[in-house]
From Swiss-Prot:
UniProt-annotated location(s): Cytoplasm
Cofactor(s) recorded in Swiss-Prot or TrEMBL: Mg(2+); Mn(2+)
Main location: cytoplasm
Active-site residue list: 147 (proton donor/acceptor)
Positions with a binding annotation for substrate: 90
Residues reported in the UniProt entry to bind ATP: 14, 207-211, 282-284, 330-334
Keyword list, A-Z: ATP-binding, Cytoplasm, Kinase, Magnesium, Metal-binding, Nucleotide-binding, Transferase
Keyword Calcium: no
Source organism of this protein record: Pseudothermotoga lettingae (strain ATCC BAA-301 / DSM 14385 / NBRC 107922 / TMO)
The protein, known as: Acetate kinase
Quaternary structure and interacting proteins, as annotated: Homodimer.
UniProt key word Disulfide bond: no
GO molecular function list: acetate kinase activity; ATP binding; magnesium ion binding
Amino acid sequence: MKILVVNCGSSSVKYQFIDMKGEKVLCKGLAERVGIEGSRLVHKVNEDKHVIEKPMKDHEEALKLILETLLDREIGVIRDLSEISAVGHRVVHGAERFASSILIDEEVMKVLEENIHLAPLHNPPNIMGIKAVQKLLPQVPNVGVFDTAFHQSMPRKAFLYPLPYEFYEKYRIRRYGFHGTSHRYVSKRAAEILGRDYYDFKVITCHLGNGASIAAIRHGKSIDTSMGFTPLEGLVMGTRSGDIDPAIVIYMQQNLSIPVEEVYNILNKKSGVLGLSKLSSDMRDIEDAAESGNEMAQLALEIYIYRIAKYIGAYTAAMNGVDAIVFTAGVGENSPYVREKVCDYLGFLGVKIDRNLNNMKGVERIVSTPDSRVAILIVPTNEELVIARDTKQIVESGIKELKLF
């Protein structure tokens, strides 16, 4: 079975084509600047990269070009579209309706469109991608895998906000959490690496990219996570503020006369590491500047690391202990400095890291010492593989929903 995994952003389509026999990635790529001048497709087969510059006015044209490229005699990997057994879609927000990966039909599409208001930036392009595939490959089943689904196991004490209860009853304002597919993959993989039973295992997973979140996973279920009603809550991120006093928003509007749209833009695109450092949202730039003596970069790093450590401490308490802590995503996988400084806060847990192992790059590994009471791991995330696995299981089994917990 060969599965096409699709992740549609507002002006991009990211894809992987995976042969599930051996779970081999046959090709992958990115259609970028979709609907914008200068659109192009970057297509990779093994180590070979091919760039196709071609106008793509919308997601349908982008997906059509991707399918044409898969069929290309020179750089393609299939001879006929019938070789595509199914398409798995990343969908950012499944609301409370979807706590599972699901076979997409008319009813599912209706629910997705009804919940656009919960993810107005992310769900519309996800929906456009699904509709385009349904048109281009009408006989091929489509499966939706939701970023929020894994966190639907959270108890009410974790997902409810202390607002008047009617805000939840009427408007479903609550913590949803995101990056669920990543947290699910790396937590399971950590249990495998350590030879532990996933369903008798307490793990804290740190997905640290430009967007960042932490999850507390006990016995295979997410019991809490740092992102909330939107991906703005929680950790200090590349350009997002994370946790702040909500009254600051009111102050910015009333006392500083900043329009609500600009407040939203400031909190999402001008804050975080970028706002604190006045320099960059890229942690590599921040670390280089901090090492060169830039005090604002040093401060941004300190605040970023401190917030991560605070959440780890809180989630250790929430689970009454922790067996392992996992670092993943761009910063989590590639910044020895961030990992080391976070772990420096965790001596009270008996955390000890091997600095030589920690300083290695790009390899899945345990970086804690043998006598560390908590295992520290680096696990590169693989959300596309999770989507492909769920898609395969649903299509092969003939089921509509794949329960995650």
